[in-house]
Design a protein with these regions (language model features):
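Polar low-complexity, Ser/Thr/Gly/Ala/Asp/Asn-rich disordered segments used for subunit assembly
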Residues: 2-50, 55-215
């Protein structure tokens, strides 16, 4: 039973993406190039937004793959507070971690692009979920938080009852009756969020929901 967004957040329903998994891409460096070479790193986000992580210019001290990789990782991390991306480097592999808020978006296409001027060389692997890359997993809590915040935006003085239930063997939506009884009959409008990962909506679901409401 919530009287505000703050109540929901106190119950753990936040929009901090704590339950998400960040996507991870990798770049395996095969040649460290020469002093003055440039490496520009860009990532395409939803709606075609291109985030430029910056252009690193190699220096004399980048005299091996290991040294160059460490320098680029440090360069990326210096801008994390601005762009939200971070990097680690080991041996010849630079791992780029995407912001959790992007969810599953980086899992398809080629969001990471690296443009080189000079003789630095490497191979990109997008977040495929193999070979030390990681596919992103979207936050469910952020979705719940959004719907709750929209409820209170439209009705600041409203009272919202929220219930989470395990996956049933049969979708009869008895949970609706449970919610109404818990509220002592005060619920006047109800919404059902069905996790599509477990079960896709069918016309039979609508019939079952109507049965619960009608009785």
């Amino acid at each position: 039973k919530f009287f505000s967004v703050a109540d929901a957040e106190s119950a753990g329903i936040t929009n901090t993406y704590s339950d998400a998994t960040a996507a991870v891409a990798k770049w395996v460096i095969s040649a460290y190039g020469a002093t003055g070479d440039t490496v520009t790193i860009k990532v395409t986000e939803p709606n075609g937004v291109v985030v430029n992580l910056g252009t690193y210019t190699t220096v004399a001290g980048d005299s091996s793959i290991a040294l160059l990789g460490a320098s680029i990782a440090t360069f990326i991390n210096a801008g994390t507070v601005v762009h939200g991306y971070s990097a680690t480097f080991s041996t010849a592999t630079l791992l780029l971690t995407f912001p959790k808020k992007l969810g599953i978006f980086p899992n398809s296409g080629s969001p990471l692009a690296i443009t080189i001027v000079g003789t630095v060389a490497g191979t990109i692997t997008q977040p495929l979920g193999s070979g030390s890359t990681v596919q992103g997993v979207a936050s469910k809590l952020a979705v719940f938080h959004y719907h709750i915040s929209e409820f209170f935006r439209l009705q600041p003085k409203g009272v919202l009852y929220v219930g989470f239930y395990g996956v049933p063997s049969t979708y009869n939506f008895n949970e609706i009756t449970t919610m109404v009884n818990y509220s002592s009959g005060k619920i006047r409008q109800i919404g059902v969020y069905l996790n599509g990962e477990c079960h896709a909506y069918t016309s039979a679901d609508l019939t079952a929901i109507n049965t619960q409401i009608a009785t």
